[in-house]
Curated annotation (Swiss-Prot):
This is PAN2-PAN3 deadenylation complex catalytic subunit PAN2. PROSITE patterns: USP_3 (PS50235). Positively regulated by the regulatory subunit PAN3. Belongs to the peptidase C19 family. PAN2 subfamily. Residues 319-458 are annotated as: Linker. GO terms for cellular component: P-body; PAN complex. PANTHER family: DEADENYLATION COMPLEX CATALYTIC SUBUNIT PAN2, PAN2-PAN3 DEADENYLATION COMPLEX CATALYTIC SUBUNIT PAN2. It is found in: Cytoplasm. SMART domains: EXOIII. Residues 894-1067 form the Exonuclease domain.
């Protein structure tokens, strides 16, 4: 290392995607053949960089993101060999793959090395019991070798030097692959190793504290002499050696690096003398490598930076570098003399062997011209004849000479037309002269023929197609969801990530047993951040309270995204490698049921009286007993070796049944193939007799193993994955009446029997066997649409089984995200092989239909309202409730306000008219929640003021509007006690289910970001009570506070406690005006004053100047209870509108009992807004 060596180039690792963050590299290597530096990352990504400037050259993936990081590079004349966790990949240097090898014995690969055959053969190993030898030229595995140890690092010298995970180094013969010698280099592990010529150098760590299991790097580098097969004197390195490399040119020189960037150039024969350099890094060194030329080295740090070191005048990577292939520059188009006389044939066409893109298939219809405009006969009758045609009064509400696109109009007649925005409809209704809006053509009409089955059509009809939410400048709240849903069953919005699961959530919600379990668990004291069972309970409660309004499962999907197992299982849309949504829904159903099984057992439920009587338990069931009875299929699997006939048994439980279809059979001579029923397919799926290859412990080799199941019990909720994978399966489902609405199941002596139709009726009449009848709750359906429509999932559910009282008839409904409409049973149970196939089916025992356990509402765990997890006793902005004296209930009013931050900026594009069109609105996250007492002696005092710990990246803290800064939400710098979103949400959810009334200003947006559904009877919104519908404008909190309360709020920023208190004072004003009978007059005065100030409170400086010009200054005032000030005549509300004496008497302070400090105001003093 010459004296002029320094950092030459520093670049940041590229991000794996546009919406992702850069990640540290997991492997780096210099190419010995080309002037390239290669880097591998944790999601299977590989990048290469060219020259001293590290210009990005190529990038590609070697494996799915879920399989882990890139481990190591080796280089061949024909390309680069990359080692992944479960695969080995070889690619050309410009990117195209040469081969990719995957094998069942590749479980956790860590290292690889060339063998005695040079670069024609490699051996790969890892933390696994098998090493594999690969022919590089053929790309095949030619040998498998049992590994005596698990290896982490391999280097090739005279021997293959392999470092084990326990701190030793094995010298492996590169020809026979046998261990020649072992050397214990370090006590615990080896962090880095290099081998060249006659030397091996290692640095590692040792266990320093046995009790605490604390490891520390060793302050030396061990050296082993391969020529004499003996250890040499260690090289001391006080800064703790993290990485080491032997110099490729100077045979006895090593470069040692610490984690903090201190580098020593040491002579192995004279370790006491060294040259020291310091790398300028802000974190710690993760990777270190030296170039084959010895004239460059690279450092990779934890801050995702690459540091290239070398001499600025001599730096190069390899001595005999081959030139790299660069993209060929595009040839400029030839200049043509293009004029009217130029024949098109002079352009010519290139020679081709494949069909051109312009050769469209004959089945593609091209639009030519447009159909004539269809005029109403009544309109034509009013026209008058002239020499040049007909003329008359324009009564069609179109502009003169306006061209109408009749082609697109006819096309849209076959689809669900998007409704008008709510603001647009309100404006049109207000401006219409007659006020008659009944002629709106966008009314959702029922089909003319109710007996028509839409599922028999060759393509997906409009009611099954994918729906999109349109956004105006007012955001998603301006979209008319009611246009798509005129039932009392709530839909779910589909513009949030992972909303493919909407149909599965709806299906589980209308299964009474699952809904009971989720709500019982949510009502307990569980505050686990990633408890999906709690989130399911919150979603089910929202859907129940919505009464037809559209909901969203944002918090549920956030918890799902935060679950570590979700991404590897392919359950997340943004990271999935699963080929279809149907497969994702099936995987999600299995995952959710396992989570329910595990999480339900953690905390005993509120009450199990209903389940005890339903399942005839002799005692109150434990959580384990109940969840096993509801969800688990208990069976014993018998595995038989077809060679030695030995049998082994293995008990187990499953939560989901995968249907197993029989192989297709051809009809015999003169006969028909036997009919396959759903019951037979279900039986095969439950018992599942299969034959596959497996290890036989008696034969000590792989043999054909036959497995069959002996069924002991089936659950009360039967979740079935359809597993439709070929055309034969589609034909079965397309058979009319193939799926029954009821099935009967008998489990007798390990045998599973299933009956349907007439067979089921016959067994029920006989009454010989104990048969359990199951009702079909519903299905998740995969709608396979073609371009431009996208394939998606819908739910078809019989909601009659979830009603509080049995309706006496089936009530099938189609849940297409936020579109909900009733369908007939024939429509629900008819499938189409072309576009409508089931993905998940759900059955429940018939005796559990319409059984809702509502005990959780009366036994709700409210301890979270009285717990204070804030360790700071000083400067608290709130005081928690007193458990002895403050007990919220149905008569309690609480004032609520929240603050948000932005997670994603809105996506906006320009349409063909040059107007800005919102594709995706801004995405918000809850940052602060404040709840203020609305009654009692502590009225106006906050009892909740939570700041939320946000896991997602925040793009804008909206400080001007929220008062939130980056330091408020950073756990390292925040002066507030940050809580999880689950904790803050559960406090509000408990208040909601205690019956409290939420008071605030513009609560609709608060509830949307909180993701909670509050019934109208529990909402008091001051933006609605001080609103005139005829004015089409809602008033801000700051303006109302200035005009009615004479208070200036939100001067510099927002504070949620201040806003909640102000809303509470405004509500008290509203009660005064309403009680005095002057509410309408006051609203007119407010709007009149708003027009004079543009509905904004005047600035304080302007008002002070106005007061200085008055001849008589106003008297000093003192605030009263509502923030009002008396004027000079002794009247209250000095400068504000006076409130005359009430007709029914003054406001009486609420009386408080010995327990409820919140109090119960009289009905006359607290009417809800109408």
């Amino acid at each position: 290392m010459d004296a002029d060596w320094d950092e030459v180039t520093r670049i940041a690792y590229p991000a794996p995607g546009t919406n992702d963050f850069p990640r540290p590299a997991t492997a780096v290597a210099f190419d010995p053949i080309a002037e390239l530096l290669w880097a591998g990352f944790d999601r299977g990504r590989v990048c290469s960089f060219y020259g001293r400037d590290l210009t990005r050259y190529t990038a590609f993936k070697i494996q799915p993101a879920s399989e882990g990081p890139v481990r190591q590079f080796l280089f061949h004349d024909k390309g680069v060999i990359v080692l992944g966790t479960r695969s080995v990949h070889m690619a050309m240097r410009r990117g195209p793959a040469l081969w990719n090898i995957r094998h069942e014995n590749m479980k956790d690969l860590r290292c690889m090395s060339f063998t005695s055959k040079g670069t024609q053969e490699i051996i790969v190993a890892g933390w696994q019991d098998t090493m594999l030898v690969i022919d590089v030229l053929k790309g095949d595995i030619i040998k498998q070798i049992p590994a005596q140890h698990h290896y982490s690092i391999m280097k090739k010298s005279r021997y293959i030097c392999a470092a084990t995970k326990t701190g030793s180094v094995d010298l492996i013969d590169p020809l026979s692959f046998k261990i020649v010698r072992s050397w214990q280099a370090h006590a615990s592990y080896i962090n880095d190793m290099d081998a060249q010529n006659d030397f091996i150098v290692t640095c590692g760590g040792s266990l320093k504290q046995q009790a605490a299991q604390t490891y520390m790097l060793d302050p030396y580098v061990n050296v082993f002499d391969l020529k004499n097969m003996a250890s040499m004197k260690p090289m001391p390195f006080p800064p703790l050696a993290a990485h080491v490399r032997l110099h490729p040119r100077m045979l006895t020189t090593a470069i040692v690096t610490s984690q903090h960037g201190q580098m020593h150039v040491v002579d192995i024969m004279n370790p006491n003398s060294s040259t020291v350099r310091y790398a300028n890094i802000s974190s710690y060194v993760k990777l270190f490598e030296i170039a084959p030329s010895g004239e460059a080295l690279v450092i990779g740090d934890a801050d995702c930076n690459i540091h290239l070191w070398g001499s600025p005048t001599k730096i190069h990577f390899t001595d005999m570098a081959i030139p790299i292939e660069l993209p060929e520059p595009e040839e400029p188009a030839p200049v043509l003399d293009w004029s009217i006389e130029t024949p098109l044939s002079s352009i010519g066409l290139p020679y081709y062997r494949e069909p051109l893109f312009s050769a469209w298939p004959a089945d593609i219809i091209s639009d030519v011209g447009a159909p004539p405009l269809q005029l109403e006969p009544s309109f034509v009758a009013t026209l008058k004849q002239a020499e040049w045609g007909l003329y008359g009064k324009n009564t069609r509400n179109v502009r003169r000479n306006q061209v109408e696109d009749t082609r697109n109009t006819n096309k849209q007649s076959n689809a669900l037309q998007a409704p008008k925005f709510l603001s647009e409809r309100a404006r049109e209704s207000a401006l219409s002269s007659g006020g008659d809006s009944s002629s709106d053509p966008q009314v959702d009409q029922e089909p003319e023929d109710p007996n028509e089955i839409e599922s028999l059509k060759p393509e997906a009809p409009p009611l099954y197609r994918n729906l999109e939410i349109k956004y105006s400048k007012f955001g998603v709240d301006d979209f008319d969801f009611g246009y798509y849903n005129k039932t009392r069953y709530a839909g779910l919005e589909n513009h949030i990530p992972n909303s493919y699961a909407n149909s599965l959530l709806q299906l589980m919600h209308y299964t009474p047993l699952l809904r009971n379990m989720a709500l019982q668990h949510a009502a307990t004291a569980c505050v686990s951040d990633l408890c999906l069972l709690c989130e399911l309970g919150f979603v089910f409660d929202m859907l129940q309270k919505a009464e037809g309004a559209t909901c969203q499962a944002t918090n549920m999907f956030k918890a799902l995204s935060g679950t570590p197992q979700a991404a590897p299982l392919g359950l997340l849309e943004e990271e999935t490698h699963v080929p279809s949504l149907a497969t994702m829904a099936q995987n999600l159903s299995r995952f959710l049921l396992e989570k329910i099984h595990n999480e339900y057992r953690t905390i005993p439920p509120i009450s199990t009286a209903l389940e005890q009587s339903l399942f005839n338990f002799p005692h109150p069931p434990t959580p384990d007993e109940l969840v096993a009875k509801v969800l688990a299929t208990s069976a014993v699997a018998t595995i038989k070796c077809m060679n030695c006939r030995s049998e082994t048994t293995r008990p187990g439980t499953t939560h989901v049944i995968d249907l197993l279809y029989p192989p297709p059979k051809t009809a015999g001579r003169g006969g028909r193939a036997s009919k396959v029923t759903f019951s037979q397919v279900l039986k095969m799926g439950v018992e599942r007799e299969t034959t596959s290859k497996g290890w036989c412990s008696r034969c000590q080799r792989y043999q054909n193993l036959q497995m069959r199941k002996t069924i002991h019990s089936v659950p009360a909720v039967l979740v079935v994955n359809a597993g439709v994978s070929n055309q034969e399966h589609r034909k079965l489902w397309s058979t009319p009446g193939w799926l029954p609405e009821e099935i009967g199941i008998i489990v007798d002596q390990g045998q599973f029997f299933c009956f349907e139709g007439e067979d089921l009726k016959l067994h029920l009449q006989r009454g010989i066997h104990n048969i359990t009848v199951y009702s079909l709750i519903g299905m998740v359906i995969n709608i396979e649409s073609h371009s431009p429509q996208k394939s998606h999932l819908v739910g078809i559910i019989n909601v009659a089984h979830a009603e509080a009282t049995p309706p006496g008839e089936n009530k099938w409904h189609l849940f297409n995200d936020f579109s909900v409409r009733p369908v007939s049973a024939a429509e629900a149970l008819t499938f189409n092989a072309a576009w409508k196939m089931p993905a998940v089916l759900l059955f429940q025992i018939k005796s559990a239909n319409n059984k809702s356990n509502l005990d959780w509402k009366t036994n709700l765990d409210t301890s979270i309202l009285y717990k204070d997890t804030n360790p700071n006793t000083e400067k608290k902005t709130y005081r928690t409730l007193d458990q002895e004296r403050e007990r919220p209930g149905p008569d309690t009013i609480v004032a609520l306000d929240t603050e948000f931050v932005s997670l994603k900026q809105p996506e906006i594009q320009m349409n063909s008219d040059g107007e800005r069109e919102t594709i995706r609105p801004m995405s918000h996250a809850l940052a602060r929640v404040s709840v203020v007492r609305g009654q009692g002696e502590n009225e106006g005092s906050a009892f909740i003021d939570d700041y939320i710990a946000i896991r997602e990246p925040v793009v804008d803290y909206l400080t001007l509007y929220s008062g939130i800064t980056a330091s408020d939400l950073d756990p390292r710098t925040s002066k507030h006690n940050l809580v999880s979103l689950k904790t803050a949400y559960k406090k509000l959810w408990v208040l909601l289910n205690l019956g409290c009334k939420f008071l605030g200003h513009g609560l609709k947006q608060d509830f949307r970001v909180i993701n909670i559904q509050v019934p109208r009877a529990q909402v008091i919104d001051t933006i609605e009570v001080f609103y005139l519908k005829s004015r089409l404008r809602k008033l801000s909190l700051a303006f109302l506070a200035w005009y009615l309360l004479k208070e200036d709020i939100q001067l510099e920023t927002h504070d949620s406690i201040e806003d909640a208190r102000t809303a509470l004072k405004l509500y008290r004003k509203y009660l005064e005006f309403d009680d005095a009978g002057i509410l309408e007059a006051m609203l007119e005065d407010i709007y009149k004053a708003g027009r004079a100030t543009n509905f904004k409170p005047p600035r304080r400086e302007d008002r002070e100047k106005e007061l200085q010009r008055q001849s008589t200054p106003p008297n000093s005032t003192a605030p009263n209870d509502c923030g009002a000030k008396p004027d000079g005549n002794g009247n209250e509300n000095g400068g504000e509108p006076a409130t005359p004496a009430r007709k029914t008497g003054g406001i009486t302070a609420p009386t408080f009992g010995a327990v409820n400090v919140f109090g119960t105001p009289s009905k006359a003093s607290s009417p809800l807004p109408k």
